[in-house]
Amino acid sequence: MDPSALQNMDRDALKKQIENMKYQASMERWPLSKSIAEMRSFIEENEKNDPLINAPDKKNNPWAEKGKCVIM
């Protein structure tokens, strides 16, 4: 961080930034290959229940239109 920026920050902002940096440093790091494998397995496990991939039954949808639009 730029030293001139530190002079302009107040004490509370510096404490908050230090807490944030400590939190980020304490996070467990994973290699990208492991992250991708975990994400892929999560997606494959939950794919069956995803309403965007498998549309729900239209008969049980209360918001689905019951009929066609009628022009008066």
Curated annotation (Swiss-Prot):
One of its GO terms (biological process) is visual perception. The modification N-acetylaspartate is found at residue 2. The keyword Phosphoprotein does not apply. The keyword Membrane applies. It comes from the Eukaryota. Almost exclusively expressed in photoreceptor cells of the compound eye with some low level expression in the rest of the head (at protein level). One of its GO terms (molecular function) is protein heterodimerization activity. GO terms for cellular component: axon; cytoplasm; heterotrimeric G-protein complex; rhabdomere. The modification Cysteine methyl ester is found at residue 69. Residues 70-72 form a propeptide. Signal peptide: none annotated. Keywords: Acetylation, Cell membrane, Cell projection, Cytoplasm, Lipoprotein, Membrane, Methylation, Prenylation, Sensory transduction, Transducer, Vision. InterPro entries: G-protein_gamma-like_dom (IPR015898), GGL_sf (IPR036284), GNG13 (IPR039227), Gprotein-gamma (IPR001770). A lipid is attached at residue 69 (S-farnesyl cysteine). It is found in: Cell membrane; Cytoplasm; Cell projection, Axon; Cell projection, Rhabdomere. Belongs to the G protein gamma family. PANTHER family: GUANINE NUCLEOTIDE-BINDING PROTEIN G I /G S /G O GAMMA-13 SUBUNIT, GUANINE NUCLEOTIDE-BINDING PROTEIN G(I)_G(S)_G(O) SUBUNIT GAMMA-13. Guanine nucleotide-binding proteins (G proteins) are involved as a modulator or transducer in various transmembrane signaling systems. The beta and gamma chains are required for the GTPase activity, for replacement of GDP by GTP, and for G protein-effector interaction. This subunit functions in visual transduction in the compound eye. This is Guanine nucleotide-binding protein subunit gamma-e. It comes from Drosophila melanogaster. The lineage of its organism: Eukaryota, Metazoa, Ecdysozoa, Arthropoda, Hexapoda.
